[in-house]
């Protein structure tokens, strides 16, 4: 008899066994992840297994065979993870703590709410209790909310919702009660931050800046544009469009507004504080409330803003005195500066970081207001430069780098209560851990790893954050300020899907370009058996300054391939992040040689180290830069591949340099503009190697992708069809550079999996 069974037979109670229908289905008798007798207690998250001496002798001997019988179907029913699981999983985000760290609030998106539609609500958990009670829903079922924040006294939670028809700010007692609408502005509130005393908000909204503080003016102008008989728009400068949106003249602008008293009428007026700056605050398209911060005294707001400068004909430089500007340099410069904005909107903005021509971001004040912490790059025009951690003495305006020897790019800044340390996450050797940085010495200590940590926040002695891995989407975790006592507040993907078997993964390394150490990951198929071989999905990440590491993606998720019976190989080639800035820099102006050498050597090394990889049945897949590499490989390294999948890739470098919107990217990566350095664009241009294409290819592109316009995909498909190569084109009229809509994601994965099955089986 197994030891676990003897323990049960001896009458010892197994406590804290998770019910099979609620999460990790661990049987108290056999210790297996199976459906067992404990499944009958599905109504509670934890149960006690009764000592068998309390049962009759006949029942005692009946229990163990029952456990065996119920275990077998569970094991046999194990299946792989697929896209329908992925889009149906809950998604948690935005952990927020009360000031004393005793209460946690977080957002959870559910695929189906009470009205049958996806909805994101707020949930809360008392962290002072150690029971297994699940988090409690805070906001009403069916409401869509985001951006939670807690009041200074910890009694009220604030959030944004479009319940009224436009996105406005709401408040709700943490103890329970109905939400109260606090703002009734004529435009959407895009982001906000509470003032230190909780009586005001700084918020951002997209407005016409000549409207000043009159929010109704923007609403009227938009109505006039909508009702105009002619649809044409005349532009005299860039951006014409950005990411997935055409420029209609609005700028993200910061405002300050008083909040009404409890039960008071929603406020409709606000004072613009950044309208005199001809830039977006926060930046488009992804800026948020981490781009601005209140001073502790509430007298000012510091914001990261890129202010475009005029330029003269042909030079691409600032206009000379007397020269007529022909546009502005916003699309090809990354000079974001920190501006101090008067919260009353009276004093002129002050540039605090004018001496740095590169990117300054993420301002955070010390509690006494004497020090301003922020992140800064050093090289203008390079979006993937290292973000160093900076400390500015507010009185003198002098700054110093806190950890100059720490060769990682900081993701955010969270200050410790005593002001002696800060917390930040960063890519690091194929993961994204949480680090603690000593402000005086610059010493960096990794606190939480084993996956990817995001959204850290600190209050009292409590850290809260989300963490994910190659086997699970985000979970909310809490720990002490040293990263100890780690506790999961929400369930993992495995607990939410007990019938799913996820593919195991392992990191490996090899010598790549320049004999440097290069890292990669291999994910086994869900149904892996020793001695068998499996077809391979070879995934190539985008960026190119990015990483395919130990993290979860709701778009490019290796488990969706492992769940179909494929092994997965991913290589962090030169240019990837988390291996030092020199490693990241190595790809610029070398898109087609150094990374390709890493991919080639990585593919060889993976096959040598993992005998279950069937190198004769392999397809390569990539998006964005990964899509560029797929096009490049089609003409320069097509021998190993039975098929290729290209999503939103660069097909023609030269036309990309003219058609993309963020010109600084193409100009940095190719060594200048297409007319000044045409050789830089043609050196590794996939379009010049179409004559060698022969491998079947699936091309995917979205109409709203203005980063790599749809014509790139159409041109590639035209070449494939004209050459008579087996090919398909999957087109999304309503998606941008990413496929975000759940139904479209299902179609994307079904089409890709069908393509793989056609060419390498499974």
PLM regions: where:
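Hydrophobic beta-strand positions that form the internal "hydrophobic ladder"
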Residues: 101-104, 154-157, 201, 301, ...
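A flexible loop/linker signature enriched in serine peptidases of the S9 family
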Residues: 108-121, 139-146, 158-170, 184-190, ...
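Short beta-strand element of the alpha/beta-hydrolase
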Residues: 532-542
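Residue-level detector of Asp-centered blade-edge/turn motifs that repeat once per structural unit
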Residues: 99-100, 152-153, 196-197, 296-297, ...
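Short loop/turn segments that connect beta-strands within beta-propeller blades
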Residues: 127-130, 173-177, 259-262, 342-346, ...
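Non-catalytic accessory segments flanking enzyme active sites
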Residues: 96, 202-204, 227, 231-236, ...
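Active-site-proximal cap/loop segments of hydrolase catalytic domains
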Residues: 557, 562-563, 570-762
């Amino acid at each position: 008899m197994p030891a676990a069974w003897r323990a049960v037979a001896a009458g010892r109670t197994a406590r804290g066994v998770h019910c099979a229908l609620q999460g990790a289905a661990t049987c108290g008798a056999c210790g297996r992840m199976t459906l067992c007798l404990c499944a009958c207690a599905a109504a509670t998250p934890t149960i006690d297994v009764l000592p068998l001496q309390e049962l009759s002798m006949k029942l005692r001997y009946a229990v163990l065979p029952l456990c065996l019988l119920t275990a077998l179907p569970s094991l046999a029913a194990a299946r792989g993870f697929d896209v329908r699981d992925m889009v149906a999983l809950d998604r948690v985000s935005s952990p927020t703590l009360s000031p004393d760290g005793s209460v946690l609030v977080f957002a959870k998106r559910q695929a189906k709410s009470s009205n049958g539609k996806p909805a994101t609500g707020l949930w809360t958990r008392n962290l002072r209790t150690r029971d297994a009670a699940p988090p409690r829903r805070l906001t009403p079922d069916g409401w869509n909310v985001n951006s939670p924040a807690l009041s200074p006294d910890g009694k009220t939670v604030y959030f944004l919702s479009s319940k009224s028809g436009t996105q406005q700010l709401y408040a709700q007692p943490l103890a329970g009660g109905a939400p109260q609408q606090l703002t009734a502005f004529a435009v959407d509130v895009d982001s906000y931050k509470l003032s230190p005393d909780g009586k005001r908000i700084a918020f951002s909204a997209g407005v016409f800046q000549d409207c000043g503080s009159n929010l109704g003016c923007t609403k009227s102008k938009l109505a006039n544009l909508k009702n105009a008989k002619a649809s044409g728009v005349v532009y005299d400068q860039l951006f014409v469009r950005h990411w997935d949106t055409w420029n209609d003249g609005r700028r993200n602008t910061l405002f300050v507004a008083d909040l009404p008293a409890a039960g008071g009428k929603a406020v409709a007026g606000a004072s613009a504080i950044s309208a005199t700056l001809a830039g977006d605050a926060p930046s488009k398209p992804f800026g948020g409330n981490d781009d601005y911060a209140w001073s502790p005294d509430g007298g000012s707001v510091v914001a990261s803003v890129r202010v475009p400068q005029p330029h003269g004909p042909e030079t691409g430089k600032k206009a000379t005195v007397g020269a007529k500007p022909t546009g502005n340099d916003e699309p090809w410069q990354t000079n974001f500066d920190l501006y101090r904005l008067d919260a009353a909107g009276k004093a002129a903005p002050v540039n605090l970081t004018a001496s740095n021509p590169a990117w300054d971001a993420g301002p955070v004040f010390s509690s006494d207001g004497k020090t301003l912490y922020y992140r800064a790059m050093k090289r203008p025009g390079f979006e993937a430069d290292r973000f160093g951690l900076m400390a500015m003495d507010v009185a003198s305006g002098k700054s110093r780098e806190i950890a100059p020897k720490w060769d990682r790019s900081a993701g955010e800044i969270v200050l410790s209560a005593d002001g002696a340390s800060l917390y930040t996450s960063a890519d690091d050797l194929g993961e994204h851990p949480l680090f603690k940085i000593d402000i005086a010495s610059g010493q960096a200590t990794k606190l939480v790893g084993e996956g990817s940590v995001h959204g850290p926040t600190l209050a009292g002695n409590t850290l809260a954050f989300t963490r994910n891995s190659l086997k699970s989407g985000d979970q909310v975790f809490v720990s002490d300020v040293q990263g100890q006592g780690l506790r999961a507040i929400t369930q993992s993907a495995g607990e939410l899907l007990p019938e799913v078997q996820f593919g195991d993964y392992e990191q490996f390394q090899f010598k790549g370009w320049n004999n440097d150490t290069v890292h990669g990951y291999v994910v086994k198929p869900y149904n892996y058996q020793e001695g068998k071989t499996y077809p391979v999905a070879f995934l190539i990440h985008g960026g190119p300054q990015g990483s395919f590491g130990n993290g979860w993606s709701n778009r490019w998720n290796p488990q969706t391939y492992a769940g179909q019976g494929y092994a997965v190989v991913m290589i962090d080639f030169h240019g990837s992040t988390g291996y030092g800035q020199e490693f990241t820099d190595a790809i610029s102006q070398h898109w087609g040689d150094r990374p390709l050498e890493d991919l080639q050597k990585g593919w060889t090394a993976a096959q040598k180290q993992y005998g279950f990889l069937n190198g004769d049945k392999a397809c390569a897949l990539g998006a964005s830069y990964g899509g560029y590499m797929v096009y490049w490989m089609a003409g320069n390294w097509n021998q190993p591949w039975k098929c290729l999948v290209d999503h939103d890739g660069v097909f023609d470098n030269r036309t990309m340099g003219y058609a993309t919107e963020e010109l600084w990217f193409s100009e940095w990566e190719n060594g200048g503009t297409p007319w000044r350095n045409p050789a830089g664009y043609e050196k590794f241009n996939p379009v010049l190697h179409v004559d060698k294409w022969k491998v079947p290819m699936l091309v995917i592109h979205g109409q709203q992708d203005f980063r790599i316009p749809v014509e790139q995909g159409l041109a590639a498909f035209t070449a494939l069809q004209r050459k008579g190569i087996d090919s398909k084109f999957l087109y999304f009229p309503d998606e941008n550079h990413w496929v975000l809509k759940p139904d479209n994601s299902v179609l994307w994965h079904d089409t890709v999996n069908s393509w793989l099955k056609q060419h390498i089986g499974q």
